[in-house]
Amino acid sequence: RQRQMCIRDRKYTVEELTELLKNKEKPIYVAVNESDVCVGYAFCQLQKQPFSNNMVQFKTLFIDDLCVDQQARGQHIGESLFEHVKKEARKMHCYEVTLNVWAGNTPAEKFYEKMGMRTKERQMEYIL
């Protein structure tokens, strides 16, 4: 029950999460405190890039969602999760770790830059 706090109000149902946990191409890393309560997680996806046949294929570990419980912030849990993701990506022989950040989410941008990430590409939209 305590670990469900990690997924409450999130984008996955318990059933979807159960299926994700079975998928080796979508690893989930969880940080727990000394009471074994979930205080953060990183949902990832192993991707093969590029999707074109005219380039050399490589593997990417994409961070779909990295989140730390608001009351546990400032304890370096996000840094620990990110470092763990990098370590696991190396074990999987990935070329890179990637993620998306919403424009204007300055705290997240600063956090990922502090962790050594750099902007790779910029996607724009025109809403109809």
Indicate where each model-derived feature is located.
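Conserved GNAT acetyl-CoA-binding A-motif
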Residues: 89-100
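Conserved acetyl-CoA-binding loop of GNAT-fold acetyltransferases
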Residues: 94, 113-122
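Conserved acetyl-CoA-binding loop-helix of GNAT-fold acetyltransferases
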Residues: 68, 74-87, 113-115
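Short, small-residue-biased leader/transition segments that mark boundaries at the very start
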Residues: 2-7
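Conserved acetyl-CoA binding element of GNAT-fold acetyltransferases
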Residues: 56-70, 100, 122-125
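Short coil/turn motifs at secondary-structure junctions
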Residues: 47-49, 71, 104-106
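Acetyl-CoA-dependent GNAT
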Residues: 8-58, 64, 82, 127
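Conserved beta-strand-loop-alpha-helix junction that forms the acyl-donor binding cleft
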Residues: 98-108, 125-128
